[in-house]
Amino acid sequence: VSANVSASTAVVVGASSGLGRALATELAQRGHALLLVASDARDLQAIAADLELRFDARVATLALDLAREADPGARILAALAKLPPLSALLLVAGVSYDDDDFSLSAARIGELLSINLHAPHAIVHALLPKLRATRGTIVLCGSIAAARGRGRNVVYASAKRALESLHESLRQAHAPNELRAQLYRLGFLATNLTYGIKLPMTAGDPDVVARTIAARLGKGSFARYLPRRFALVAAIARALPWFAFRRMRG
């Protein structure tokens, strides 16, 4: 299906690298018109040109700094004005800091919360009427880090756990008749963020994860781990007695 005659638009927030870029490619290939949102305009332009050439896709872009934008939802709404009706919102953008171990300044805590929590809430609130009108899908990206709080990724994990509450609120208030709310608790993925880092498990392939997410758009509301093997890791972490868990401070 050519995206030039596509009946609907998917918004990918965090579209310039890793899973977001893989999702942009997968959705373009499936015939969606796209609004790609990321912080770097040049990266977005290059991705859009590639997707337009390879898939005859209709692609709009919006450069947005989620750490500093007070109302990202309003900016995205304005960018959607000339695109087909909105059918999917995929909130992939996220950031973590190596020193998120109770060492962060107030300013850097604010940056983490702006990107990982404020922006998803603001964007969902702004786009909710459009998504309800089309019975669309909201995809939130959580993290295995939220399974149990540790002395690392303190703010990041707190924000990701809060997204679990947002997902539950969307399901309770609007699913299944008005929209679909899908939460993916992501494990380690092979991206530039994990390159060169010694990981405790084999990282997942962003292209494979993107295909799974794209294939499930519109197919119910749920929360699940991706890659699926990380569900066992999270279950073990939650089941550990406190005396054992508290020793895992590395």
Map each language-model feature to its residues.
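Substrate-binding pocket helix/loop in short-chain dehydrogenase/reductase
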Residues: D100-L113
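Conserved glycine-rich cofactor-binding loop
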Residues: S16-S17
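Conserved glycine-rich Rossmann-like NAD(P)H-binding loop of the short-chain dehydrogenase/reductase
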Residues: H32-I47
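Conserved NAD(P)H cofactor-binding loop of Rossmann-fold oxidoreductase domains
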Residues: V92-D98
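C-terminal helical subdomain
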Residues: L183-Y184, K198-A234
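Residue(s) in the substrate-gating loop at a strand-loop-helix junction
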Residues: S143
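Active-site helix of classical SDR
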Residues: V124, A159
